[in-house]
Amino acid sequence: MSEFDELKYLTGFGNEHATSDPRVPDALPVGQNSPQKCSHGLYAEQLSGTAFTAPRSQNQRSWLYRIRPSVIHRPFEAMKENDQHWTNNFSSIPPNPNQYRWNPFPLPTKEGVTFVDNLYTVCGGGDVISRTGLAIHQFSCNASMEHTAMYNSDGDFLIVPQQGALEITTEFGRLLVNPQEIAVIPQGIRFSVAVRGPSRGYILEVYGTHFQLPDLGPIGANGLANPRDFEAPVAWFEDLDVEFTIINKYQGSWFQAKQGHSPFDVVGWHGNYVPYKYDLKKFMVINTVSFDHCDPSIFTVLTAPSVKHGTAIADFVIFPPRWGCADNTFRPPYYHRNCMSEYMGLITGCYEAKEGGFKPGGGSLHSMMTPHGPDFNCFEMASNADLKPQRVAEGTMSFMFESSLNMAITNWAVYQNVDKDYYKDWQPLKKHFTMPK
């Protein structure tokens, strides 16, 4: 059993937390942020997640009390090898409106592949320079990052492990993230990923905004992802005087710098700009108890809003186990043409509308206004099913990244692992129309 299996967490979404490593319980200053001399010879450093003048209800920042300030490092140099399958530049990619489905992305075939070594971009839209957009990536690895940390200057990472637990060390402390859990690492926070074996998963990256809980409207004060179930790390530090590599994703490109100490030297911190995790199995599902199929927005876990009210740069939506009991209703998802782009992934089990070709570790993209919906077998079965109450999606967990932006498929993903027969899922659908007599 690893130390990570025994971790304790701070609870609550967006809370104003305060924590010190138990080895130095008085690390935080009392009544101020930046004393003339911090206790134990620590340095005070603020990490800003929003503009200073953002409304107080939206303002995000944390104060870190660390052994050395982050500014102690040698100059950054470009890392060309990391740009091979990664991009945040979608403007030059040819458009492609077809339905796409990818088979499970392969695990590494050679040893020593870390999280940061094997990140590859599937699709995305927007722009990191103007800081409005998103990108969807996959990762696969089989080795831990040793004396290496990374951070994203462009935006937030929402990490969805599909196979293998991730032991994530951050400046704020440590997180154990298992499949069917997610982690969010906000912009600028340094972190390192250790694994226990072959691991893979998905990443939703957003720039120019942060994830927040969706409004509940008429649902009321409770439901969906409850704030109390989000977990942030307690302070933990290491005082290591060894060479570390700091990897920085900046304007969609990769850079690295060397420094002579661990970046995970924060002895205490307070604030509301933090990394966090969430167990998807704790999601409280809302569904119809009368008739018709509810829109998938009722399954939203987190949203990254755009400047247009009610419209997201990205929503993170899940389809967890639940009861289906709608009367006189076609219960699977309906046929749809959407003004949003929909990327789907599968963590475990099978997806209710496509039980055959959609496998854990794979994905699908239905671009803006591209038709999609249940395959032939699903339609035939659901149209003739006995409409008794039954469990839906039992033993499965699928998810969707939905965006108001057009998404371009990268040149790499157009050809890699593609299910070229995906369109055939709908070809057997029959004409059932009969004219009235």
Curated annotation (Swiss-Prot):
Region (Disordered) residue ranges read 15-34
List residues binding Fe cation. 336, 342, 372
An example GO CC term for this entry is: cytoplasm
CDD domains from the UniProt entry: cupin_HGO_N
Listed pathway(s): Amino-acid degradation; L-phenylalanine degradation; acetoacetate and fumarate from L-phenylalanine: step 4/6
Please describe what happens when the gene is knocked out: RNAi-mediated knockdown together with fah-1 RNAi rescues the impaired growth and fertility defects in the single fah-1 RNAi mutant.
Q: In which tissues is it expressed?
A: Expressed in the hypodermis and intestine.
- Cofactor(s) needed by this chain: Fe cation
Q: What Gene3D superfamilies does this protein map onto?
A: Jelly Rolls
Matching entries from InterPro entries are given as: HgmA_C (IPR046451), HgmA_N (IPR046452), Homogentis_dOase (IPR005708), RmlC-like_jellyroll (IPR014710), RmlC_Cupin_sf (IPR011051)
Query: What's a single GO MF annotation on this record?
Result: homogentisate 1,2-dioxygenase activity
Q: Which family does it belong to?
A: Belongs to the homogentisate dioxygenase family.
Q: Please give the name of this protein.
A: Homogentisate 1,2-dioxygenase
Q: Which organism is it from?
A: Caenorhabditis elegans
